[in-house]
């Protein structure tokens, strides 16, 4: 007998089915009773069935052997396990796709869509694989398709698929099978079997069957003693006229397909409409949603729409509501269901918040296996095979902790050495073949502290050698192997020999001992999956290919998931929309109801588009057909959402966040808007933080989770939460105290106590100008950098700093080589200069830190470009050498303690009358001298890799003291530079090291008559000296004789020219009279002493400067320590304004308390 029970979505048809099945079993235990449900709810259905049987038999514990609760896949295994047929080896999807790839390549010349190798992508192959399964499941004979009814695109697809399909099925036959094979075998068994006549079947919670499942149902209903099916429709009735677009079209279509079969087979069947239950809020909401009932006031209490500030607020609303309902209203955790269209969006919010509130839950979103260390190890082995010993892959392999050498007695010690080794290889640019070199061959670069620790380097080298040895041996053995069995054996032995299996077993035992059964299962499951993948590979591989072997493993693992078991029955269930759910929940949360998530419309086509499938079914002359799963899903969205709304007996919550993690505005789903309109429910706003005492209850759960919100409210003077905080402190005293103290935290660094400052710095600091400039840029950064000596991890990169060093050293070596060979720069020919530059570069590139940079081919190219730049600048000097009397005299000239050139020293007494000293040391890139008419003239040149000017605003604030300090060093070392004579200083200048040309499209290149200026001449201007100079016409004429001419323009110094009246036009804010220069020098001394005084007294401020678009935070390595936030009251930028020369000089006089004219 065939029975069809129809009810509405709110009717508990599953309960009716279980009742009937249990009674049938109880009344006659000689026949088998089957309850067939979707796999997703098999476990809960089994629990409910056994519970009913327990009540019926009045026994606490029951054992059954003829009552079966199964899914379709388990039903296949049940019937086939005792059959005298050889069950095929089921191929993993990855192995099937690999087999498909072989077939496509074998037939490539015959195909129309895959004529190019680039078209054979993993995505295209997977789409074709799913199409093959669909053709097989739909019993389609591609040869019977009428091509006249197909367009060109569909015709090409059918042509290619037929060739590939035939070969694919041929290779499968009698050897192995795809994932759908068991369903096909089940139907073959059911078609032949005579054993069903004594069996009773019940089907529940289906609205749609796959083609093979539908075949199973038809065969079972034809042969079984009794078959009962329950379906939920819009109004609890069968509608034979349902059309596409109707609310319950998909389920009505399923019923129609079955009725059509029964009628054709002349089978008797009866339909029963589930009796209407008394009206309740759930049925009222269903009536409103399906538009079968009108508005009812009670709905506004049954449905609660929630507008949340963020996904975090949304997740917290769920946790808080569950916590309070369990605590106050006698709910159990198992009474709650949380649904989301996309649970991945809530992965970092929902489960951590539930754990924080000690709420047990079961998340049935399967955990992917691809993040397990074993899978990570396989991925990095593949990358090492493809790319060689790239550092990121080798280190990642080490960090899996699967290949720990035997000499390590603790994992912590091993991990520490891996971290140190990572620091070492990054600092020295070790990658590729360099991994095979001993570490001691890199230490001469002396770029990190480890370079000076011979013993530590030896220990790390042992670790390096171990890994490179086992990997080299493994790849050497496996790369040339052609036999699949031998290749897999090499891989297996590699894992076993290196104790990977033992490591996994240790993890299993560790998790098991800790009581984490879920985690304890993972090592075993991932190892078992690896075994299955290896077997699959051996089934399909004709010849061993390491590339294909790794592809199969990684593809297989990417599809694999860890099986999950609920740790307790009383737990909140978390699931995704669209998955069948059991009934019996009291409250249901639908979260993430945004316009992009609901309805869940699928848009990505498979191998066949909806249009292709329609043509194929029209052109099919046989009985089979291809089902458009995407179209069915999209047509079923309203119905599926109605199912979710029908799951709760007491209350439904539907929520959406107004912003996502990228702070982008989100709109509510059309479903959310419809419910809001249909129920007239009041929308509740869940904020990230409470704003008043009235909001407090919407954030209160357990002491730990509520503490942060209470602390936040305590900071609001208008809210009194002291009494609640006292209760909280009684529960979690120390934690509460720490959080409360933290709430008073101000992001302001404290000054060092005098004693600590004394211990850290002493009474005397030896520092450089650039370090003191850091103090004025942000004194907290100075403390971290030069007080605590914190440094970011050094990486061997040819960055701006390294490039600058290379520029400096190139010119240093060049100047010294010219002096060493007693050459005059003016007498050099271009070829001789080039030869000297070649010699310089060869010497430099033998130095450790440059040598290791040159191991990278791209760096070689960059060095070539740097060399072009230095050549450009050197030749510019050479072309101007006869235009000036200056000659480079000193290069990279150090000054300070124990140097020939005395540094700057300043002393003062602090408030305790203790003498404090700052000694200034440093290095000048180049000092040029000229002896003219018994006078010695001098200038300082500072190399910069980008254009720079002497900025008065930055100097006034202590951020640009370098050039003035250099001038002071020149003046204080008069004897050294002028051998007892007076040294007349012209200035200190920046030399821009560049080879860039001015853009032809630049406004600067267009004359008033629209003619283009000389490109080379305009570009050369970028190389002219620019800085601070003494406005002394006599000195200038001695240095650059060409300036004596009428209306002359300097070819060496930027922005200097002789006016028509014969006077010199000096750059406005970069030129100073000798008296004005003395003021600058005095102010510079004041700045140095002031910085030294504050450093030695322990003063620290978080006061980064801003100047236009510049900020001292832009390139800071310590932003994660600063936590600087300009929105906080206590965090403020030190804003610098541009000033002119007159303002600067007045400021200096004010600061130094001076009077008088300039």
Swiss-Prot record:
Cofactor: Mg(2+)
SUPFAM superfamilies noted in UniProt: P-loop containing nucleoside triphosphate hydrolases
Source superkingdom: Bacteria
EC identifiers of the protein: 3.1.-.-
GO BP annotations, alphabetical order: double-strand break repair via homologous recombination
Top-level EC class as recorded in UniProt: hydrolase
Alphabetical list of InterPro entries matching this protein: ADDB_N, DNA_helicase_suRexB, P-loop_NTPase, PDDEXK_AddAB-type
Entry's Gene Ontology molecular function annotations: 5'-3' exonuclease activity; ATP binding; double-stranded DNA binding; helicase activity; hydrolase activity, acting on acid anhydrides
Keywords for this protein: ATP-binding, DNA damage, DNA repair, DNA-binding, Exonuclease, Helicase, Hydrolase, Nuclease, Nucleotide-binding
Coiled coil start-end: none
Record text on subunit structure and interactions: Heterodimer of AddA and RexB.
More about this protein: Despite having helicase-like domains, this subunit does not have helicase activity.
Entry similarity comment: Belongs to the helicase family. AddB/RexB type 2 subfamily.
Physiological role: The heterodimer acts as both an ATP-dependent DNA helicase and an ATP-dependent, dual-direction single-stranded exonuclease. Recognizes the chi site generating a DNA molecule suitable for the initiation of homologous recombination. This subunit has 5' -> 3' nuclease activity but not helicase activity.
HAMAP family attached to this UniProt entry: AddB_type2
Entry protein name: ATP-dependent helicase/deoxyribonuclease subunit B
Chain's gene name: rexB
């Amino acid at each position: 007998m065939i029975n069809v029970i129809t009810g509405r979505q709110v009717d508990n048809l599953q309960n009716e089915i279980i009742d009937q099945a249990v009674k049938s079993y109880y009344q006659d235990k000689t026949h088998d009773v089957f309850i067939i449900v979707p796999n997703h709810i098999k476990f809960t259905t089994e629990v409910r069935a056994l519970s009913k049987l327990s009540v019926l038999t009045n026994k606490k514990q029951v054992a059954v052997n003829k009552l079966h609760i199964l899914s379709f896949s388990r039903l296949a295994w049940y019937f086939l396990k005792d059959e005298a047929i050889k069950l095929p080896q089921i191929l993993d999807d990855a192995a099937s796709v690999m087999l498909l790839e072989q077939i496509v390549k074998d037939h490539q010349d015959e195909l129309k869509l895959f004529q190019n190798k680039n078209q054979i992508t993993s995505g295209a192959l997977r789409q074709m694989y799913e199409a093959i399964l669909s053709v097989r499941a739909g019993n389609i004979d591609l040869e019977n398709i009428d091509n006249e009814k197909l367009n060109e695109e569909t015709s090409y697809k059918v042509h290619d698929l037929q060739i590939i399909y035939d070969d694919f099925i041929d290779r499968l036959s009698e050897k192995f099978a795809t994932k759908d094979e068991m369903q096909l075998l089940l139907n073959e068994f059911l078609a032949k079997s005579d054993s069903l006549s004594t069996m009773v079947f019940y089907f529940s919670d289906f609205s749609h069957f796959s083609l093979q499942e539908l075949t199973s149902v038809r065969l079972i209903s034809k042969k079984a003693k009794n078959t009962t099916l329950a379906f939920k429709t819009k109004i609890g009735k069968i509608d034979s006229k349902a059309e596409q677009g109707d609310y319950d079209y998909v389920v009505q279509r399923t019923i129609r397909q079955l009725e059509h079969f029964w009628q054709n087979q002349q089978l008797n069947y009866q339909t029963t409409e589930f009796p209407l239950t008394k009206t309740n809020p759930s049925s009222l909401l269903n009536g409103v949603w399906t538009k079968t009932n009108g508005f009812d006031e009670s709905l506004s209490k049954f449905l609660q729409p929630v507008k949340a500030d963020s996904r975090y607020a949304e997740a917290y609303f769920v946790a808080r509501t569950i916590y309070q309902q369990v605590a106050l209203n006698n709910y159990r955790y198992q009474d709650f269901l949380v649904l989301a269209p996309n649970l991945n969006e809530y992965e970092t919010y929902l489960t951590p918040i539930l754990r924080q509130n000690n709420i047990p839950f079961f998340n049935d979103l399967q955990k992917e296996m691809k993040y397990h260390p074993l899978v990570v190890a396989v991925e990095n082995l593949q990358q090492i095979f493809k790319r060689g010993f790239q550092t990121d892959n080798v280190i990642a392999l080490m960090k899996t902790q699967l290949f720990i050498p035997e000499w390590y007695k603790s994992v912590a010690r091993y991990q520490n050495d891996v971290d140190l080794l990572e620091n070492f290889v990054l600092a020295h640019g070790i990658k590729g073949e360099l991994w095979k070199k001993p570490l001691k061959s890199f230490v001469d670069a002396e770029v990190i502290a480890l370079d000076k620790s011979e013993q530590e380097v030896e220990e790390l080298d042992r670790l390096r050698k171990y890994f490179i040895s086992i990997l080299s041996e493994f790849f050497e053995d496996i790369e040339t192997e052609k036999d699949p069995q031998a290749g897999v054996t090499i891989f297996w032995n590699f894992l076993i020999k290196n104790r990977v299996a033992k490591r996994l077993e240790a993890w299993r035992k560790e998790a098991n001992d800790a009581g984490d059964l879920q985690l304890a299962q993972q090592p075993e499951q991932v190892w078992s999956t690896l075994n299955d993948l290896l077997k699959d590979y051996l089934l399909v591989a004709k010849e061993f290919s390491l590339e294909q072997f790794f592809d199969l493993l990684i593809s297989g693992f990417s599809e694999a998931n860890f099986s999950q078991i609920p740790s307790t029955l009383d737990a909140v269930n978390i699931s995704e929309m669209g998955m069948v759910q059991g009934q019996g929940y009291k409250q249901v949360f639908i979260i993430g109801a945004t316009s992009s998530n609901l309805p869940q419309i699928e848009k990505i086509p498979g191998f066949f588009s909806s249009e292709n499938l329609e043509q194929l079914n029209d052109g099919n002359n046989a009985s089979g057909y291809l089902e458009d799963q995407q179209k069915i899903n999209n047509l079923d969205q309203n119905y599926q959402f109605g199912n979710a709304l029908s799951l709760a007996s007491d209350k439904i919550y539907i929520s959406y966040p107004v912003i996502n993690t990228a702070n982008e505005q989100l709109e509510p789903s059309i479903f959310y808007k419809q419910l809001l309109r249909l129920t007239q429910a009041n929308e509740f706003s869940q904020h990230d933080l409470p704003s008043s005492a009235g909001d407090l209850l919407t954030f209160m759960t357990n002491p730990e989770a509520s503490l942060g919100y209470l602390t936040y409210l305590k900071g609001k003077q208008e809210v009194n939460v002291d009494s609640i905080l006292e209760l909280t402190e009684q529960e979690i005293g120390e934690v509460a105290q720490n959080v409360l103290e933290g709430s008073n935290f101000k992001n302001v660094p404290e000054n060092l106590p005098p004693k600590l400052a004394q211990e850290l710095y002493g009474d005397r600091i030896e520092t450089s100008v650039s370090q003191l400039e850091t103090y004025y840029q942000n004194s907290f950064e100075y403390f971290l950098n030069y007080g605590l000596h914190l440094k970011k991890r050094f990486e061997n990169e040819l960055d701006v700093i390294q490039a600058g060093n290379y520029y400096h050293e190139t010119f240093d070596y060049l100047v010294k080589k010219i002096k060493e060979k007693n050459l005059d720069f003016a007498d050099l020919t271009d070829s001789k200069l080039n030869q000297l530059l070649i010699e310089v570069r060869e010497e430099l590139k033998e130095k450790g830190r440059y040598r290791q940079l040159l191991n990278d081919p791209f760096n070689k190219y960059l060095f070539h470009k740097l060399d072009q730049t230095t050549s450009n600048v050197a030749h510019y000097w050479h072309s101007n050498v006869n235009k000036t009397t200056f000659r480079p005299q000193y290069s990279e000239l150090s000054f300070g303690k124990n140097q020939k050139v005395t540094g700057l020293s300043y002393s003062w007494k602090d408030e305790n009358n203790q003498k404090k000293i700052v000694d200034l040391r440093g290095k000048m890139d180049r000092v040029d001298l000229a002896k003219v008419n018994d006078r010695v003239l001098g200038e300082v040149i500072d190399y910069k890799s980008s254009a720079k000017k002497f900025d008065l605003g930055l100097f006034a604030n202590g951020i640009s003291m370098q050039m003035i300090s250099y001038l002071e060093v020149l003046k204080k070392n008069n004897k050294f530079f002028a051998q007892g004579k007076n040294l007349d200083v012209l200035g200190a200048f920046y030399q821009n090291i560049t080879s860039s040309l001015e853009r032809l499209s630049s406004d600067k290149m267009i004359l008033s008559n629209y003619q283009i200026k000389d490109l080379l001449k305009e570009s050369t201007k970028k190389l002219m000296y620019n800085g601070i100079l003494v406005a002394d016409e006599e000195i200038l004429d001695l240095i650059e004789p060409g300036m004596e001419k009428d209306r002359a323009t300097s070819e060496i110094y930027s922005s200097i020219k002789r006016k028509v009246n014969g006077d010199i036009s000096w750059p406005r804010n970069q030129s100073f009279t000798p008296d004005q220069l003395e003021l600058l020098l005095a102010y510079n001394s004041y700045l140095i002493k002031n910085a030294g005084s504050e450093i030695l007294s322990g003063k620290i401020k978080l006061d980064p400067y801003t100047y236009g678009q510049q900020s001292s935070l832009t390139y800071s390595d310590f932003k994660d320590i600063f936590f600087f936030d300009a929105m906080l009251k206590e965090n403020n930028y030190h804003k610098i304004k541009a000033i002119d020369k007159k303002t600067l000089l007045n400021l200096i006089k004010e600061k130094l308390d001076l009077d008088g004219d300039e």
